[in-house]
Amino acid sequence: MLKTMRRHGITLALFAAGATGLTAVVNSLTENTIAHQAALQQKALLDQVVPAENYDNDMQAECYVVTDSALGNMAPHRLYLARKGNQPVAAAIETTAPDGYSGAIQLLVGADFHGNVLGSRVIEHHETPGLGDKIDIRISDWINHFSGQHVTGDDDKRWAVKKDGGSFDQFTGATITPRAVVRAVKNAALYLQTLPPQLSRLPSCGEDQ
């Protein structure tokens, strides 16, 4: 009887150890797959705001943390540096439009260091479906209108919605949202013009984690 119980106990222990090991292996493989997919999605997003022909480095590996009120608030925002021939040429930077109709709007803006916008995407918002949500690339191509635009300075009158005398369309029944996004993209592009002297002093994203 005792031998039988001992044998069953050993069997159960071996089974438990095997199950635990298998679970650990599955979890490890799953985590690696999820991380890989997340990296691919991030790379695709970066390429939408800084087209791949503009750089030859690994932008994801050159992630830095910036904090400046020009980015909508004093929260840390991430910046991904683009290089060509080892020279900094542009960046993709997170920024916030704090004055959206339904709250803050989070964006990723790509621009060079001379005021030329390369691309922009809304990455988080709570705008009203059918009205303010046209800022989302999945709903309309309105956000693409910033690509190729140049910002000359803070007093550049073109950087406003048409209702305010600027160059960008507002939405029918929704002016607050596009106005907020136009301002945020403009401010991000202006901020990037000031960035090159600071690059060597920026903390990396790894240091921020």
UniProtKB/Swiss-Prot annotation:
Keyword Magnesium attributed: no
Gene Ontology CC: oxidoreductase complex; plasma membrane
EC class (word): translocase
Keyword Nucleus listed: no
UniProt entry keywords in alphabetical sequence: Cell inner membrane, Cell membrane, Electron transport, Flavoprotein, FMN, Membrane, Phosphoprotein, Translocase, Transmembrane, Transmembrane helix, Transport
Chain's role: Part of a membrane-bound complex that couples electron transfer with translocation of ions across the membrane.
Name assigned to this protein: Ion-translocating oxidoreductase complex subunit G
Species this protein is from: Yersinia pestis
Organism placement in taxonomy: Bacteria, Pseudomonadati, Pseudomonadota, Gammaproteobacteria, Enterobacterales
Gene (UniProt): rnfG
